[in-house]
Design a protein with these regions (language model features):
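Membrane-helix interface segments
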Residues: 16, 243-244, 333-338, 634-635, ...
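Secretory targeting signals
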Residues: 24-85, 153-228, 249-329, 383-384, ...
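Transmembrane helix boundary and interhelical loop/hinge segments in multi-pass membrane proteins
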Residues: 221-236, 240, 244, 612-627, ...
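Central hydrophobic cores of alpha-helical transmembrane segments
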Residues: 22-24, 335-348, 467-474, 725-738
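Short, membrane-interfacial amphipathic segments enriched in basic
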Residues: 1-4, 190, 432-450, 579-581
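Alpha-helical transmembrane segments of multi-pass membrane transporters/translocases
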Residues: 17-20, 31, 316-324, 349, ...
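Juxtamembrane non-transmembrane "cap" segments at the membrane-aqueous interface
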Residues: 279-286, 355-376, 430-437, 668-679, ...
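Membrane-interface helix starts
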Residues: 8-23, 334-336, 454-469, 725
């Protein structure tokens, strides 16, 4: 117990841990609020109290009576919309139609008509009610249809099993049909109710919280395992017979306890924020009352389901915590810990998000730690897995697999902690390298600060491996071609047109367009002739017409896009712009691609988070920071030498990640269209002289400035934390996680601002990046050199 309390104090006494915890809570709350405070949710947020009152009112009525009253009110809003349309139109035919419809409403639905008249006299002040009435009517329709959904389950299974695909009684498909019907039959008499489920659903579906919790668990592991290793304290944990055993047990118990507390805390905060936004949810209703959980076969209330959701989060984070503990015990290198831990978790996330439900790899999707963390899907949906042609419910299988993983990680963590030397020692490859260097490499005795720092970064901290990997990645990625998938049938024909037309508008190209126009006019004329030809049979007419329609629906649509582009280019040419034909599909994605922009920048930030912390933290780790005072400006020169090393690393990483795509693009499509004005592709561009290559250069400059700011922020964190692993974790919270959140926002990227002429946003981003870089650089310089300054002042005094 004393060891447990000591380990707890060791974590809680660290100000950085508390700062990161509250920072994560604040960022998570802000991102949750931002994700809910959208234009689509505006009515729900504004009138949440009124919506709750309406639900209370209708839930007290029988469903049939409530449906009848709601239908009448919805009809009143429909009649009101006809009044509005009649008042706004001046078309005589529409006026006649609206007048006739209103007379029919007045005759057949006098109550609804009178209510619509009253609404019109008030000016439609309560139009928001229409939205909520429709929502409640959908809930009532769902409640009324649910018994039929359950009753027909067995009939559907019987009907499907009669087909040849499902007829084999020993197959998974056959067993799955009847197991599903039997499992749902237990819900036959489930009572459903109207409920305001907005806060409940928003809490269940918000998954970004898991990333924050994983980051905090990673930080806890740093304090429990890496901190003592870097301080060289593990050699002292042998003073009693069971010193290491008791120590690792205390560490693991504390890790699991803190992980569960943090996980519950985040879910509680999420539910509190959503309740504040949308109003409370009646947690006493059956979970099937919420239409999103129609497929849930658990006989639980909404409150009990919320507890199961929290339990799933805790179990999932237990498994991740045990795996992180094992990684921290096995590896002594901070970079290997970071890459192995987050790399494995990231791979699991990719499997869960990218593998389809019906894929032959779906076991990797569902026997997955993120399937557990997604508690709403884990407990809220019905899924049977194919285990040796048997239909087995996914929940016990997943629990069994990850329960085993948890036990194995925990047991091996205890064994390895007790048996292995936890002090950081040189590995076999490091020893072989030292022998090789002693025979074939002689030190030149250089006193250059830059050479010394570059040597420490590349050789001592093994970042030469990362640089080599980046160079290899750049070389390999430069080969190949760039291909854009066709989203429509006409895209291939449009590309064929652009391959011929691309470039300046010439008389030859204009004649070609005229020929194509005549060709499609003749096709239209031919369609009419076929329809009027009495000598052809109906089958022949249909076959010939279908053939022409296929041409018009693919090549014809593509040519319509060409004509639209041609007319727009002629208008631009009249304004004195050097208008050119260009493939809009290809170059729109080339200039502004949400996925490529954020993937490249997120990967660049990840590379920086792995490498940059080693530049400054090494001096604190080996205690050399106190010896760097041989001259008056020794620390200042050393500081800028380290900054130069960071900038070189940044430049290598940026070049390796960004340049290969442009090399492949030019190899595929050439460089002829790079000087085409951007306004030829995007109509919103205000600067008419801005070309494609200008947009690309601006994009790269902005991202390089952002990356520079990120580099200096990581440097500042490493100087304050004095630990490479702490820096990686905190930088992940400050940089990587916000990037994942920003990915969901379409207009929060440089490419979008460039093509929409948001010049102010671009300039402000550049200025803010430069300001952050300068401020963090000055703070880092002051912190790194403050010991020397105070010693000099004391000496002079």
């Amino acid at each position: 117990m004393k060891l447990f309390i000591y380990e707890l104090k060791k974590v809680l006494n660290k100000k950085i841990f508390l700062v990161v915890l509250f920072l994560c809570l604040a960022i998570n709350g802000f991102l949750l609020y931002s994700s809910q405070n959208t234009e689509e949710n505006n009515l729900r947020l504004t009138y949440s109290d009124e919506y709750a009152k309406m639900l209370d009112n209708y839930s007290s009525m029988p469903c049939d009576e409530a449906k009848k009253q709601i239908d009448n009110e919805l009809l009143a809003y429909e009649i009101f919309s006809r009044f509005e349309s009649l008042a706004q139109t001046d078309n005589e035919e529409l006026i006649e139609n609206y007048t006739y419809e209103l007379e029919e409403y007045k005759k057949n639905n006098p109550t609804a008509y009178q209510k619509a008249v009253e609404m019109s006299e008030k000016g439609g002040e309560e139009l928001w009610k229409n939205y909520f009435l429709y929502d409640i009517s959908q809930q009532i329709a769902y409640i009324n249809s649910y018994p039929d959904f359950i009753d027909q389950m067995y009939d559907r299974a019987k009907a499907q099993s009669s087909s040849s695909i499902f007829s084999d009684e020993n197959s998974f498909s056959y067993k799955n049909l009847y197991k599903t019907a039997n499992d749902y039959s237990e819900l036959k008499n489930t009572e459903l109710s109207l409920v305001n489920s907005d806060a409940f659903i928003a809490t269940i579906k918000y998954s970004l919280t898991d990333i924050f919790v994983i980051a905090i668990v990673l930080l806890i592991c740093v304090y429990l395992f890496q901190y003592e290793r870097e301080k060289g304290l593990y050699s002292l944990v042998r003073c009693t017979k069971f010193g290491r055993a008791k120590t690792i047990i205390s560490k693991l118990v504390l890790l699991f306890a803190l992980a569960s507390v943090v996980s519950v805390l985040f879910v509680f905060c999420n539910f509190t924020i959503n309740t504040f936004l949308y109003g409370g949810t009646d947690l006493s209703v059956n979970i099937q009352s919420i239409s999103e959980f129609r497929n849930c076969t658990l006989k639980v209330t909404a409150g009990q389901f919320l507890l199961l959701f929290v339990l799933a989060k805790v179990i999932g984070i237990f498994v991740i915590s045990s795996f992180f503990a094992l990684v921290f015990i096995v590896f002594s290198s901070s970079a290997m810990m970071y890459l192995t831990g987050l790399g494995t978790v990231g791979t699991e996330y990719l499997f869960y998000t990218l593998i389809g439900q019906n894929s032959f790899l779906n076991l990797l999707k569902y026997i997955n730690i993120f399937y557990i963390l997604d508690g709403g899907e884990f407990f809220g949906s019905y899924l049977n897995l194919n285990i040796f042609s048997n239909a087995v419910t996914s929940v016990p299988i997943v629990f069994a697999v990850f329960g085993t993983v948890f036990l194995l990680c925990t047991v091996f963590s205890c064994i390895l902690f007790c048996k292995r030397n936890q002090q950081k020692t040189a590995g076999i490859f490091s020893r072989l390298l030292e022998k090789f260097k002693s025979k074939f490499y002689t030190l030149n005795g250089s006193t250059s600060i830059f050479k010394g720092e570059f040597y420490k970064f590349t050789v001592q901290n093994k970042m030469a491996v990362m640089i080599v990997l980046l160079v290899l990645f750049a070389i390999i990625s430069s080969f190949g071609t760039v291909r854009y998938p066709y989203s429509e049938n006409s895209d291939a024909d449009y590309k064929a047109y652009m391959e011929y037309l691309e470039g300046d508008i010439t008389s030859e190209k204009e004649n070609y367009i005229l020929e194509q126009q005549n060709y499609f006019n003749n096709l239209q004329q031919r369609m009419g002739e076929i329809a009027e030809n009495s000598e052809l049979s109906e089958n022949a007419k249909q076959a010939m017409s279908k053939s022409i329609e296929n041409i018009l629906n693919s090549k014809g649509i593509a040519f319509e896009r060409v004509i639209e582009q041609y007319n727009r280019l002629l208008e631009l040419d009249k304004k004195g712009i050097d208008a050119k034909f260009i493939d809009e599909n290809i170059y729109k994605s080339f200039v502004s691609s949400k996925t490529r922009e954020w993937n490249n920048f997120a990967l660049l930030c990840l590379v920086l988070v792995i490498g940059v912390p080693y530049v400054f933290s090494v001096e604190y780790k080996n205690g050399m920071i106190n010896l760097i005072r041989t001259t008056e400006n020794s620390k200042t020169k050393l500081f800028f030498g380290k900054i130069v090393v960071e900038c070189i690393y940044l430049l290598i990483a940026f070049t390796a990640l960004y340049v290969p795509y442009f090399v492949r693009f030019i190899n595929t499509y050439g460089a002829n269209s790079l000087n085409t004005p951007l306004v030829c592709i995007f109509e919103n561009v205000q600067e008419t002289s801005f070309s494609v290559i200008n947009a690309v250069v601006v994009n790269l400059i902005c991202y390089f400035l952002l990356a520079t700011a990120v580099t200096f922020v990581i440097s500042a964190v490493s100087i304050f934390t004095r630990s490479s692993m702490f820096t990686m974790v905190i930088s992940t919270v400050l940089v990587i996680i916000p990037l994942l959140a920003l990915y969901l926002i379409e207009n929060a990227r440089i490419g979008y601002w460039v093509v929409n002429s948001h010049i102010i946003a671009i300039v402000m981003t550049c200025l803010l990046s430069i300001l952050i870089a300068i401020v963090t650089l000055e703070i880092s310089k002051f912190k790194f050199t403050e010991t020397r300054i105070w010693r000099r002042i004391n000496a002079k005094a």
